[in-house]
């Protein structure tokens, strides 16, 4: 019995020591996750501020600055757009001066992609610029690449579009 008690005592002590050793790394990882969340949520704000004002001179090009040249945009209702240029042409035609995009508060989640960047996902809603009424909502996912100190969206998915129920 004493050997079993001694074994479990050593095992528990080793587990406690390894948990203490892991704690500083966990703090560093949490700080890194917080920094990534702050960075990507800031990118979302900047990207869509330019999107929402794309009828103002220079804002569509500012919006373009966040997008990879070979951007792929997947929209459940509109299909796939294979380049930044095609996406910008569609945005100018269908979005600018018509509606704005709003992030649904509390819906944003950000996940790191090792040696690449991050995934951003959440819910957004769309609101008419003339009436200020929000008419639809959808889920979204953006794949961000971080290369040479610059972040750019390489893939954007907007899906599950549905009307917002009137109250």
Question: Locations of the language-model features?
Answer:
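Bacterial N-terminal signal peptides
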Residues: 5-15
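Short, low-complexity N-terminal intrinsically disordered segments enriched in polar/charged residues
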Residues: 18-69, 164-167
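A solvent-exposed, acidic/Ser-Thr-rich amphipathic alpha-helical stretch
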Residues: 38-39, 57-116, 134
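Generic short beta-strand segments
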Residues: 69-72, 121-127, 160
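A short, structured loop/turn motif at beta-sheet edges
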Residues: 110-118, 132, 144-151
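A short hydrophobic beta-strand element
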Residues: 114-124, 138
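Short beta-strand edge/turn micro-motifs at domain boundaries
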Residues: 137-166
């Amino acid at each position: 019995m004493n050997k079993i008690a001694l074994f479990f005592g050593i095992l528990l002590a080793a587990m406690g020591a390894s948990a203490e050793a892991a704690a500083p790394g966990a703090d560093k990882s949490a700080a890194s996750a917080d920094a990534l969340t702050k960075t990507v949520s800031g990118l979302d704000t900047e990207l869509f501020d330019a999107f929402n004002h794309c009828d103002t001179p220079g804002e569509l090009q500012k919006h373009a600055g966040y997008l990879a040249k070979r951007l792929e945009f997947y929209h459940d209702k509109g299909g796939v757009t294979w380049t930044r240029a095609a996406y910008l042409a569609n945005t100018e035609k269908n979005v600018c001066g018509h509606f704005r995009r709003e992030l649904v508060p509390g819906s944003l989640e950000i996940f790191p992609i090792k040696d690449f960047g991050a995934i951003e996902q959440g819910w957004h809603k769309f609101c008419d610029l003339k009436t200020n009424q929000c008419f639809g909502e959808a889920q979204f996912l953006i794949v961000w690449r971080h290369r040479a100190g610059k972040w750019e969206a390489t893939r954007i998915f907007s899906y599950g579009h549905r009307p917002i129920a009137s109250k």
